[in-house]
């Protein structure tokens, strides 16, 4: 890339200040993402390790690539040694390629989670995700190695002003652009199109599925022991479920939480059309598990963790439960403890309802997280497409289609800006990341989840 006239002092200061802010914001934001995933219970799903690796790649761009690109841009020539130029170019391709291959892997993970939920979620373990991440980095390394092995034609070198540029041969430009950007983009578009079709087909079957397993929406289970189930709806359970529809926080059907028995997995939740017993004294909002009013100020920041501590669990009837006053229960029944009350379970109805509820909540979480990742992928493509398009166009018809230097540099830096945008996207579109960021910034962080 030939450089134009040097920038004025004012322009140099403005550009340096803006890029320095970009570097600091990228490091801070992506470090926050890594801490959030590693320390937040609501973000400890194995697939979120993809986001940790992606954030690490963005931090490496901000620390090893952008500062030297800034110096090269402002000085108009490569100030550093020739060996570092070759390493710098290879790392630039490596980190950019790893970012888009990460997104491609995330897209495939989303597709398998939506299309083969039961089969795939049982195999979606941290070890398996880490193996996929390692494969992603190996693919990126293979694509980035040619500049180190084959120097090729780097164009004329001005006297006294060394330049640091990639191989200028058309075959390499086209091959690297296809391997680093266009091919992964095509895969992601096809995968997300398939996910959209699956979701559309699922929505068409929605009215049949909303009534629960094997029953319509209007059907109510018969009371056990003379009216054990009241006629009221289950707002508390619905609110817990909606609060837990978070960023991919789904467990496989074969997994259990600590302290959870096989019997609990079948009786811990009910479809929303089933009924709840009114809980006396619970009409207005209180601190979770009878917390004192002083603790309510912290409740908003730790809502997810508190809900997990008191999430719906089927427990044997006893004189008092963990989260509510004692109630008189029919013999042989079980009670479902929730944040705002109790639900009495008749005999034999918990297993089917629990499986239905967990399956439906899992699908909802997958759909919401898929939307967030679609935004991440869309922003990435918007940021990098102008650069790769103009870069490839210059190789196809270098004399008549070459983009002006200033515009090409603008596209170049817009691509780098993408490294700072993912934390912003997570904050805007995902409440779990918002809560995790708030907790990290306002109090000491806790033990990592892995």
UniProtKB/Swiss-Prot annotation:
Residues 312-326 have a biased composition (Low complexity). InterPro entries: ADR_fam, ADRA2B_rcpt, GPCR_Rhodpsn, GPCR_Rhodpsn_7TM. One of its GO terms (cellular component) is plasma membrane. SUPFAM superfamilies: Family A G protein-coupled receptor-like (SSF81321). Pfam families: 7tm_1. It is a multi-pass membrane protein. The record marks 176, 180 as: Implicated in catechol agonist binding. One of its GO terms (molecular function) is alpha2-adrenergic receptor activity. Its main location: membrane. Disulfide bonds join 85-164. Residues 1-12, 70-86, 150-172, 390-405 are extracellular. It is found in: Cell membrane. Keywords: Cell membrane, Disulfide bond, Epilepsy, G-protein coupled receptor, Lipoprotein, Membrane, Palmitate, Receptor, Transducer, Transmembrane, Transmembrane helix. Residues 246-256 have a biased composition (Basic and acidic residues). Belongs to the G-protein coupled receptor 1 family. Adrenergic receptor subfamily. ADRA2B sub-subfamily. PANTHER family: ADRENERGIC RECEPTOR-RELATED G-PROTEIN COUPLED RECEPTOR, ALPHA-2B ADRENERGIC RECEPTOR. Interacts with RAB26. Interacts with PPP1R9B. Interacts with GGA1, GGA2 and GGA3. This is Alpha-2B adrenergic receptor. It comes from Homo sapiens (Human).
